[in-house]
Amino acid sequence: ALLLWLLDASNNTAMEPYRAFIADKLPPSQTGKGFLAQSFFAGLGITLANVSLYVFQTLLSGMTSAGIPYWVFGSFMLGSVCSIGTVLVSVLRTPEIPPSPEELARLRAKKGDSFGPLREIGLAIIEMPVQLRKLALVYLFQWYAMNCYWQYVSLSVGKNVFGTTDTKSATYESAVSWTGLVNGWYNVITFSVAFSLVALARRRGAKWVHICALLCATVGLVIFPHIGNRFLIFLPIVGLGIAWASIVGVPYIMAVRMVPSSRYGVYMGIINMMIVIPMLLQTLTFGLVYKHLLGNNPTNAMMFAGVLLGLAALAMMWIKEPPIVRDVDEVSDPPNVRTVRVGEVES
C-alpha cells in the first residue's frame, strides 16, 4: 500500500508544474477553461487506462507463482511508457516563459542558498491566505474519500454484484475487469461535463459548482454498493464522474485567485501536498477504520467515502469565493463573489 502511495505521490509531483504552467500561460479570464481542459484530458486518459485493463485481461492470460496476473504487469508497463512519454513531449515541445530581469536577478541571488527553497515553502505556508487554509480541509475530506473508493471499489463490486469476496478466484478477476469498465464510465462522464463546468463556474461561482458536484458524488456512492445488477451500477457512478471533473479542476480556479501570481509555483506545490498528505493519512489509518468501524465490509467503505465527500461539500461552504477574474497580485478576502474585468477599476 505504501508503494502505491509513493507511486501516486510521484505522479502528483510530476503533474504539479502543469497546474502552475496553466496559471502562468493563460490570462485570468481563461484560467477556468485551462484547468477544466485539464479535467477533460485527465478524464479521457483515465477512461482509456480503465478500458485497457479490460483489453489486457483478454490478451494476457496466466499469472506468476506469486499469484499476480500477467495483465497487471502489462498495465503497469503501459502506464510507465505513457507517463514518461507525455512528460517528455511537454518538456521538449512547450516553451517556458522566460523570467524577467528582476526575477532572474532574484534567482541568481538565491543560487548559493541551499536551504532557500525550503525557506520559501515554509514562509509560504506561514503566509498562506486564510481561504486557502480552509480549502485544505476540503482537500482532506475529498482526497481521503477518493483513496477509499479506489482501494475498495473492486471489493464492493465483487461482493455485491459478482457475489464473491475471494480475491484469488476467477470470479473476482471478472469483478476487477468489470470495475475497470465502471471506472472508465465515470471518467467518460468527467470529460463529457468538464467544459460545461466552466460556464457554470462563471455564472454561479466555482464554490457552488464544486459543492453541487461533491453532493452528486455523495448520493452516488451511498447508492452504488446497494445495487446488485452489473449494468445498473453505472447509473449512480455518474455522480462521481461529475465530482471528479470538478475535483481535478474547479478548486484550482479558486486557488489561483487566492495567491499572488509571482508565487503560483510554490503554492501549487503546497496544494499538491494537500492531495498527497490526505492520501498518505488514509493509507496509514483506514485499515483500522475498515476493520473496527466498518466491519471489513466494502459496502460500508463505499458509503464512508460518500459521507466524506458530503463533509467536503460542507467544508466548501465555509470558504469565501475570491473574485471571478482578477488582474492584480494583491489578494483580499471579499465578502461576496464578484466579477472584475481585466483593466476595470473598482470603486
List each model region and its residues.
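C-terminal ends and interior cores of transmembrane alpha-helices
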Residues: A1, C216-G228
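Hydrophobic core of transmembrane alpha-helices in multi-pass small-molecule transporters
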Residues: A1-A14, L232-S246
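Intracellular loop-helix junctions on the cytosolic face of multi-pass helical membrane proteins
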Residues: L2-W5, T13-A14, Y18-R19, K25-C148, ...
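Intracellular juxtamembrane helix-capping segments at the cytosolic ends
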Residues: T13-L26, S246-P260
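Loop-to-transmembrane helix entry/capping segments in MFS-fold secondary transporters
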Residues: P28-Q38, V176, V259-I271
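Loop-to-transmembrane helix entry
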Residues: L36, G163-V188, N300-M303
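Helix-to-loop junctions at the C-terminal end of transmembrane segments
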Residues: S192-A206, Y290
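A late C-terminal transmembrane helix in Major Facilitator Superfamily
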Residues: S262-H292
